[in-house]
From Swiss-Prot:
Catalytic activity, EC: 6.1.1.21
GO molecular function annotation: ATP binding; histidine-tRNA ligase activity
Family classification: Belongs to the class-II aminoacyl-tRNA synthetase family.
Name of protein: Histidine--tRNA ligase
Keyword Protein biosynthesis: yes
Designated gene of the protein: hisS
Amino acid sequence: MAKAKKQPRPKAITPKGFRDYFGEEVTQRTHMLATIAEVYHHYGFEALESSAVETVEALGKFLPDVDRPNEGVFAWQEAEDDGKGDWMALRYDLTAPLARVYAQHRNDLPSPYRRYAMGPVWRNEKPGPGRFRQFYQCDADTVGTASMAADAEICMMLSDTLEKVGIPRGDYLVRVNNRKVLNGVLEAMGLLEDDPKRDDVLRTIDKFDKVGESGVRELLGKGRLDASGAYIDGVGLEDHQAEPVLAFLTSKGDTVTETMTNLRAAVGDSKVGQEGIAELELMGSLFAAAGYGEDRILIDPSIVRGLGYYTGPVFEAELTFEIFDEKGRKRQFGSVAGGGRYDGLVKRFTGQEVPAVGLSIGVDRLLAALREKGRLAATPTGPVVVTVMDRDRMADYQAMVAELRQAGIRAEVYLGNPKNFGNQLKYADKRHSPIAVIEGGDEKDRGVVQIKDLILGAKIAESATLEEWKERPSQFEVPRTELVAKVREILVSQSSDREG
């Protein structure tokens, strides 16, 4: 009789571009999301939770990779017997689902509709160091008003959010630009809306932060050699045609007034360009009136990312402190959030233009920034562990842990094999437990428990002298009736030591 073929065991590995998150990271992210939600709620925004799956039709062409519509997402087609054979996809951001939600429920929603949303998004793109296919976003949007006060409010809320999560003033800057100003520049160049060179110019402008003014000048003209030595063809503009773009990119002055003067020169007589400048001036006045100075929010025409997507103001939150990259070189941390006005997104569903403005915070990048600066909370304290000295007295240990929990103290009974007491303490150490509670048969007969301060014990083991150990022992005996009070007292003392 032939042997049955042995089935290979599945490999226990995460898919490429994905990762697992454990206790401390999850706790830190949960805390950050709650802090951000508190700011959004304070501004009057309401929470929205939409499906992680949308139809590809609903997502439309506002995909991560605009040059490859329907690429860059995790998509599949429903079977005909399950539905209509529709293509479905995991959401790649939180904005496209909002457009669908607003179009579907607009008759029941207040106008303007102010919502915030938080959660994972998925992008089927090539992963890299620190770049994953699943990551968290935290958005807030106002749909249904064209007022620049909405745009200004979003920028101010972003500033408040960064400070609330632990980025102090001086370590960040919210920079603001306007797509209409760029449209005015394109008009001043003689490039009308149907001119194919407009997209080439936009792509070139997007490289400004990488190649600088001289690089953009070359790419707008005949072309340039990149760092690898390869030649990149240029847009083919004459020098005089390229000047308005260069004037636009370098128009930031020492004051807002100077910047606006430079922008007016760049857009010339363009009506849409002048409209964009007026919007920036209005936003600037609103920032000033609310007490948000240029050390927090700054009008800056050099912000060009996303200008192909947005229809009006666009902004980016940049962290200005320096970090060391993987090669030990100093660099600025860079952008952690962005947003702007996108008046065309809902129109795909309704046929009518619906004004909207919003922001999106990259939660994982913001967490990485706080971790880099040592501004995240230390490793969270684990539960108090009630050890098991006699497996036949589990009811006694459960009674202890129940008392601790009823007093609001996080606690658990050791549920592994209690035979080796040392393994119980190793378990408590791995859980970052602050205290272990011990009650053997002798303690039970005498009506006492042993309490072991694991935090103090670790410190003593590292550096304390014999005299210090005698003066402040890490393990002591208390009456069983005082268990809760003594545990609480030690936890308060440990908390004070951490804060001190």
